[in-house]
Amino acid sequence: MTQVHPTALVDPKAQLDASVSVGPYTVIGPHVRVGAGTTIGAHCVIEGRTTIGRDNRIFQFSSLGAIPQDKKYAGEPTELVIGDRNVIREFCTFNLGVPGAGGVTTVGNDNWIMAYTHIAHDCHVDNHTTLANNTTLAGHVHLADWVTIGGLTGIHQFVSVGAHAMVGFASAVSQDVPPFMLVDGNPLAVRGFNVVGLRRRDFSAPRLAAVKQMHRLLYRQGKTLEEARAGIAALATEMPEAAADVALMEQFLATSTRGIAR
């Protein structure tokens, strides 16, 4: 049987697995679904069409599924979808999507999301990310797998941060951050590549060498973006062990909509 504190208000239409725990004074709306093993702390509000997966830990005072902070929103049935095994710390706010842009805000699996983080409408946070305290994502931001965002960082609408990239403390991010890169500051500057993070993920020496070379091509040799992209494409045959990493970078550069941080 679901463990619901007697002071919590759970709408009878909400769908909670029998193993879900709900803390004191939490409010859960009628269109909410919560999977097995998830624990919800005290004083949380979970509303809207919000789906939460298995084994998440949601700490006190979090607000999930509130209407988007977008003046165009007019009550349409948009969604928030959260995956499995996420840690969502105190005072986090995740908003529903808006129509015309997919209408769904998503958070994947195994993310570590610290206190006061804001995830706005239509953001897509993939898997294994770390978002430190007071991270603020504006609408339509995409964070790929294994991204790390330092505390007090703001990310502009429609920005993409590529896989394995790290953004340092108190940064202002207004352009796309390529995979593997290490950036920080306001204005934002590329400081190198995320060698410590990649080593922690067991990147081999050849893969690290390829990432280092991609960084050099983009940022250290005075090349235009087109010249750098040509050099990066050639690495797929020169460094076959890193072909997947090269392809990831090529795809990111080809699909960037805000221009890359340089």
Swiss-Prot record:
Q: What GO MF annotations does this protein's record show? A: acyl-[acyl-carrier-protein]-UDP-N-acetylglucosamine O-acyltransferase activity
> Which CDD domains does the record cross-reference, listed alphabetically?
LbH_UDP-GlcNAc_AT (cd03351)
Keywords assigned: Acyltransferase, Cytoplasm, Lipid A biosynthesis, Lipid biosynthesis, Lipid metabolism, Repeat, Transferase
Give its E.C. classification number: 2.3.1.129
Pfam families associated with the record: Acetyltransf_11 (PF13720), Hexapep (PF00132)
Xref: SUPFAM superfamilies: Trimeric LpxA-like enzymes
Q: What's any one GO cellular component for it?
A: cytoplasm
Biological processes annotated in GO: lipid A biosynthetic process
Domain of life per record = Bacteria
Which pathway does the protein contribute to? Glycolipid biosynthesis; lipid IV(A) biosynthesis; lipid IV(A) from (3R)-3-hydroxytetradecanoyl-[acyl-carrier-protein] and UDP-N-acetyl-alpha-D-glucosamine: step 1/6
Swiss-Prot/TrEMBL catalytic activity: a (3R)-hydroxyacyl-[ACP] + UDP-N-acetyl-alpha-D-glucosamine = a UDP-3-O-[(3R)-3-hydroxyacyl]-N-acetyl-alpha-D-glucosamine + holo-[ACP]
The protein's location, in the record's own words, is: Cytoplasm
The similarity comment for this entry is: Belongs to the transferase hexapeptide repeat family. LpxA subfamily.
Question: What does this gene product do?
Answer: Involved in the biosynthesis of lipid A, a phosphorylated glycolipid that anchors the lipopolysaccharide to the outer membrane of the cell.
Q: Describe the protein's quaternary organization and the partners it interacts with.
A: Homotrimer.
Q: What is this protein called?
A: Acyl-[acyl-carrier-protein]--UDP-N-acetylglucosamine O-acyltransferase
Organism listed in the record: Variovorax paradoxus (strain S110)
